[in-house]
Every structure is written in C-alpha cells, then in structure tokens.
Amino acid sequence: MMEQPSTNLTADVLIDEEAEPDLSIWFGCLETARTELAQAAIAAAAVEGCDRGSVGVRICDDATIHPINREFLQHDYPTDVISFPYELEPPMVEGELVASFETAIENASEPSNPLSPREELLLYVVHGTLHIVGHDDQSPEPRAAMRRAEIAAMKLIGIELPLSNDEDSAPEQDDSFDDDASDSSGGIMSGGVS
C-alpha cells in the first residue's frame, strides 16, 4: 500500500458474515480487509478532491446485493457494486456503497481479467466511490474519465490497472458496473433495505 493523502474523510466498512472467510484469505485477516477497503474508498474520493465527510462500504454476497439491485435500480440480477450518493459539495462527500465479493470471484476468474478477487473487489469500492463523488459511466466520454480516475485511485493504493488500447479511452463498458442509486433513501450499512 502506498501512503494515503491526508484527509478528514472516513470510510466505515461492514463485512457481512458470508464474506468473512474469503476476505480473510484474500487480505490475510479481516482487519487488513477493512483497512484496505477503506483506503480504496478514500483514495477514490481524494482523486476528485473530496477529503471530508464519510463513505460507508458494505461487502456482501450475491444473494444480498440482488434484491438491492432490484429495488433501487430495477435490475433483477446480482451485480458488482451499487452506490448511494447522499451529499456532494466538494470537498465534502457523503454516501454508501454495497459490493459483492461473489461477483468479484466470478469476474476475476475470467481469463481476460488480470485482477485477483481481492483487486477486483478493491476496484468495485473505487468504482462505487467514484459514482458517489459524481462520476458517470453511461456514455463514452464520461466513462473514459471515470476509467482514468479508477486508474489513478488504484495506483494510490498500490495496484496498477491495465490500460486499454487507447490510453485516453475506457475499455468497452462492463455491464456489471451499475449506475448509482441516487434516488434511494439509503440504509445499506444497517444490513437491509426496506
């Protein structure tokens, strides 16, 4: 891990019980997992000049993220990460995200993916945090800007992402990366949705 920038931004990490065995293996122990996941959120916010406020990070399984995806984004399938931005007035940011460790395992197993499940999950936290701080990936130009921010944030935490063929553009959109759920009322850190 590289040294993190000075910040008054906190990142609280909740790891669901189902994720604990895998994360203990990937990160060495749960405390290291919490620390690295928090650092990923803080790094992503810092890339966009947000260094005050809080980001909640919840790591869950596909069975947990599926109904959240259905309720807030009307997508009836599990996904990798969903963001809930609550307030953004840089340098202040408030939001939460939920990410699936099982989707990280599945996506990291793809032959074309050079990332380990640990790195894939850290990328989900970075990606979700970038949605919280205002990034969009629904069209090519914003998607390319988001990809550059992902590369910068991952580098801050010591992970080099592979560049696309054209360094200034993002790879084809990965449909597993979801929009933010900005119309939501939140509550993902408490372990459920209404």
Curated annotation (Swiss-Prot):
One of its GO terms (biological process) is rRNA processing. Its cofactor is Zn(2+). Residues 162-194 are annotated as: Disordered. GO terms for molecular function: metalloendopeptidase activity; RNA endonuclease activity; zinc ion binding. One of its GO terms (cellular component) is cytoplasm. Residues 165-182 have a biased composition (Acidic residues). The keyword Nuclease applies. Keywords: Cytoplasm, Endonuclease, Hydrolase, Metal-binding, Nuclease, Ribosome biogenesis, rRNA processing, Zinc. Single strand-specific metallo-endoribonuclease involved in late-stage 70S ribosome quality control and in maturation of the 3' terminus of the 16S rRNA. This is Endoribonuclease YbeY. Its EC number is 3.1.-.-. Binds 1 zinc ion. NCBIfam families: rRNA maturation RNase YbeY. Zn(2+) binds at residues 127, 131, 137. Belongs to the endoribonuclease YbeY family. Pfam families: YbeY. It comes from Rhodopirellula baltica (strain DSM 10527 / NCIMB 13988 / SH1).
